[in-house]
């Protein structure tokens, strides 16, 4: 479903449900007038406030433990880069659905307490206006934080109560102006600003204290047992695959087989359909026609996380990571399917396959596990993405321009890593690359795409010495006879 579709359904569905409740013949809900005077608890106002405070502290503490656990890092990753999560094999829709249900349950507890306090249940209490107020609380306090919505709710409620009594004609204008000012000048909200101030003060107070050596506090790297043992002789087979965008045909009848322990490079001019082919292999909803077989299983119309479960791992043309997470958190995220993350504990040790450990040691990322991803160089980000994909233990590794933007020494290192992978892992590698020297050095076979068609599939020597390939890269017109040659 598109974001627009979800937004419309989210807005319209509650309206329909409310109208159905209004029209029920038994008047169980009191229709549009609501319910009043029903039996409640005999508690004083002060006791109700104590209950409200206790419930707030309980759920806030539980949320803090949850967000700071290993599973909480998954939620942060989904918020930051949902597509990358899906291609790592994480069922983001399932996680968001359960999170939505849990949030609704907490809201139900709050509604139960509020109804018991006021002895009134009416539709307008939790209507569209109240929903808008919740969004304002979140935006003002700081989205992506736990304390932010609490701060926003307290500030707005207290200021509204004070201003409505002293400035009854302009208080809404003042509150609205403050909200607009915060959105314009402090878009992250008040809570992050307060936390930055606290960190600044702490940095000044403890400036003379001995600094902790980050190398002494690194998570322990443990060799994980290799679990992907169901790799077929032909892990990847593409049959008559085509992709249309409206009336434009981008891929036409692509047939391709890749055997185990083989590196196959896809080359071709810009616009040949190379990245589109990658998308069609790694996302079952992309192809218009044809089929993709992974380890003998026909993929069909399935999502990227289901294809990852079958054994497909993919890196992107533009490095796709989680800028706000640490290197260790990213690697732990990649092991989501192999090791279910704890919901209330933050386990530091990392169980990683040998291929991932080799990359970390070769690039010295094993000494930077606590470093934020946003602080890494482009070359290290490329290496980290490859390490994450290998941590999922794929049998088919898809690499889209893995050497883009790298120095010569970094390209040499990547070439060495990829060739070593075939010696230690039963997998096949399909990569897109424009660096023909790199392709020549590591490839078992080369596939040539041109205008969405597979023109040539042969050994390195056959492709390098092909007059057809020279014609393509020189920009000469290719005839139908040459295409079918």
Predicted regions, residues:
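Transmembrane alpha-helices and adjacent helix-loop boundaries
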Residues: 1-213
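The feature captures the beta-strand-to-loop junction immediately N-terminal to the Walker
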Residues: 267-269
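Helix-to-loop junction immediately C-terminal to a conserved catalytic motif
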Residues: 282
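Conserved ABC transporter NBD signature motif
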Residues: 290-298, 310
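Catalytic Walker B motif of ABC-type/P-loop ATPase nucleotide-binding domains
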Residues: 397-401
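A short, surface-exposed alpha-helical micro-motif characterized by mixed small hydrophobic
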Residues: 439-441
